[in-house]
């Protein structure tokens, strides 16, 4: 078989399935480093890897100077993603860009 010939996954999964699963896991589980029996996240799937899980991390990704609800370009809040497949970070960049496009559309309407 040639090196670049497409071969579908036997279970018909996209490789992005696993990247999205990593984002879901990182949204739902943030163990407290001082007490491993505590989870420091909310019970919501809230895209905290993109937007931040507290005010300090939210302020690091939001461009408040413009006052338009934008995020800094191609940024996300989650520092733990260095240990997951790069596709998870790529998905967050796509979601960040989509957020900014939608924020700018709200400004126009």
Where is each model-derived feature located?
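N-terminal accessory/cap region of cofactor-dependent oxidoreductases and related radical enzymes
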Residues: 1-106
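Structured binding elements
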Residues: 109
């Amino acid at each position: 078989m040639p090196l670049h010939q497409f071969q579908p996954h036997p279970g018909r999964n996209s490789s992005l399935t696993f990247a999205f699963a990593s984002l879901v896991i990182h949204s739902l589980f943030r163990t407290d480093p001082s007490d491993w029996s505590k989870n420091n996240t909310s019970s919501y799937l809230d895209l905290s890897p993109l937007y931040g899980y507290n005010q300090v991390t939210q302020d690091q990704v939001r461009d408040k100077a413009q006052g338009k609800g934008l995020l800094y370009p191609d940024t996300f809040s989650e520092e733990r993603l260095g240990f997951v497949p790069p596709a998870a970070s790529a998905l967050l960049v796509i979601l960040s860009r989509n957020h900014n496009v939608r924020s700018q559309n709200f400004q126009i309407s």
